[in-house]
Amino acid sequence: MKVTYDRRTDSLTIVFLDKVIAESDEDKPGIILDYDASGNLVSLEILDASSRVTTPTSIEYQVAA
């Protein structure tokens, strides 16, 4: 998994799979879901991230037991 925040575009992208994107769907305004040819979720993009996420430049990562 890879998380990227682009200050220039104010977008936060979370990539779950390293696959070619076949289709994108704007689930809600400013929330874009990308899928591969098999319908698997590849990535999630949040537009205007600084207004939607408290601190887009910081990430906390946890693994549940």
Where are the language model's segments positioned?
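Small, basic N-terminal interaction modules of short regulatory proteins
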Residues: M1-A65
